[in-house]
UniProtKB/Swiss-Prot annotation:
It comes from Humulus lupulus. Keywords: ATP-binding, Cytoplasm, Ligase, Nucleotide-binding. Residues 429-498 are annotated as: SBD1. This is Probable CoA ligase CCL12. Transmembrane segments: none annotated. Belongs to the ATP-dependent AMP-binding enzyme family. It is found in: Cytoplasm, Cytosol. GO terms for cellular component: cytosol.
Amino acid sequence: MCEVGVEDLVKAGLSTEEAKYFQRVLEDIVNGAKGLDPSEVWREVVARRLLKPSHPHELHQLLYHSVYANWDVSTRGPPLYWFPSLHQSKKTNLGRLMEKYGSEVLGPLYKDPITSFSLFRKFSVQQPEAYWSIVLKELSVSFQEAPKCILDSADKSKRSGSLLPGSVLNIAECCLLPTSYPMKRDDSPAIVWRDEGYDDSEVNVLTLKELREKVMLVANALDAMFSKGDAIAIDMPMTVNAVVIYLAIILSGFVVVSIADSFAAKEIATRLRVSNAKAIFTQDFILRGGRKFSLYSRVVDAAPHKAIVLPVNGSNLGLQLREQDISWEKFISNVSNQARSNHYTPFYQPVDSLINILFSSGTTGEPKAIPWTQLSPLRCAADTWAHIDAQVGDVFCWPTNLGWVMGPVLLFSSFLSGATLALYHGSPLGHGFGKFVQDSGVTILGTVPSLVKAWKNTQCMKGLDWTKIKVFASTGEASNVDDDLWLSSQAYYQPIIECCGGTELASSYIQGSLVQPQAFGAFSTAAMTVGLVILDENGIPYPDKQECTGEVGLFPLYLGATDRLLNADNEKVYFKGMPLYNGMSLRRHGDILKRTAGGFFIVHGRADDTMNLGGIKTSSIEIERVCNRADESVMETTAVSVAPVSGGPEQLVMFVVLKSGHNNEAERLKKKFSKAIQSNLNPLFKVSFVKIVEEFPRTASNKLLRRVLRDQMKHELLVRSKI
């Protein structure tokens, strides 16, 4: 590692006395690890808790980059920052499973959860019925009619296979009933929450029994107003009431239509039309970051048949309703005075019955309407159980919305594993959210990278104690190594499990794992039971374990993945044009995946994020990673390629958002970016244009609208050509 002197430590924010002590301990660690791998030095730095959450981020940066200064990423893969101990690994869900069944399914090849993980995962791919028969016993799932078998792959019309054929259940009931394993009692905390602005108040707690009674009350009210099978939308923040409504709709045999609370009226209307929703649950306003935003008025502009409207706080609405709409208070009062209004007999259905209509983010055209059946919650809960290690006693928080796939994933993953769901009714961007994480004792914190960047840059979480967190999770976009370094450091370098998947998969196809070492911004494994290959430009799979970059192809037997779309051709979208592999037609996902040395995966954007520069295909994500580090004034960049108006090779254009308080010139950045790209990627690449903007266009789920930027640049070049 690079030598770190007292002067360096003082520059990083320590006092002279602190720096001297720090250096002595560091020297002791380095001397003790002489001749050992840099990762062993970092492992010891973390184990001794030399770096503390209260230390300046500059100090964490200094040590991490000094330890790994001579690390060769090209031959060794990304640097490791978290290492499972054998003792820790045996306490994880997967570790317990492997210790119990490892010798049975792997024979003498089984050693321990860390050594044998890759073999056990391979077993889950090759014998999914055996794996699922084991894992389903770990979740609180009860059937009214037991499945005929675990897996039926005879029906070739269902490429993803038929899981649990013949079984009948109600998945919402499974969330609400006490169970002996996992241990869920009536008095177990099901949900903890706090309203924004009440940061010094006690955290609110809802027990499993209280949740069940609330859900059953709403289920009775739904029965009084709708017919079985009706689609009913939810467009509101993910509050306790939203969770109650979601579960009640499913418990009573209706179908949830998930709509994000950030959508404009036109987008709401599209989703109501496609789903044929009979009504919508919404709020009068949204309170976020101390500001009040109208929600009901947007919903009304979408012209729903009927709206059931909740007040943002208190019991009185702050506005006048349309004639056909009804207040939450009146909706509930229709049944609250009836005998046994808190009791309800669930509507039991076959396992493949529709329960939820979700939508793709819709970066182009009409969003795909993706049906979730009762299998989908089983898939996402099993993956969260295995990879993020959600279990009884955990408090699980992930700022999201029921309109996006992470909302239902969070809900089912918590309740089916016995964890407590943690909800903050307000903006996750400020100190109030962080204090809720501290006060509620969150042990699993899910994030999106842009949220982490905001926390780090604003320093809004300073002084808070997040050390009860045992694991972080991240999804939605590519993670930034420095932002992840900051996040992990807030809990003494606990692991961040990266997750990448899709609504139609009801899960992530690549993730991290608590029985493997982890690297920032990288995925350590394909998910349990998931088979995949990386394809070259001719659609031929690279050999397993070979370092490569290409489009990912998923094995078609993907339990829990949807086999139909409500407004598109599932076969055309996910299978048409994909190559065969060992007689199987691969499933399209659209990600460009890099398999690194060391066996990690890094997502290089979507297949349509690739560009052709001078005849060389490259990933825009790769270029952005280099340019983001090229100048200290840069907050983030987006790379697009645009063909000149007169034709010819594509030109590289960089859009830039500067950090607050920083200024720069496009021409200066153009030179810096070109130099950085030529040094780090390819000497033949150069930046043709740089455009500084205030922010990037994104979808409501925070996906970058690269197409919009590309179209803007095409228009600008066209105008320039006419001058």
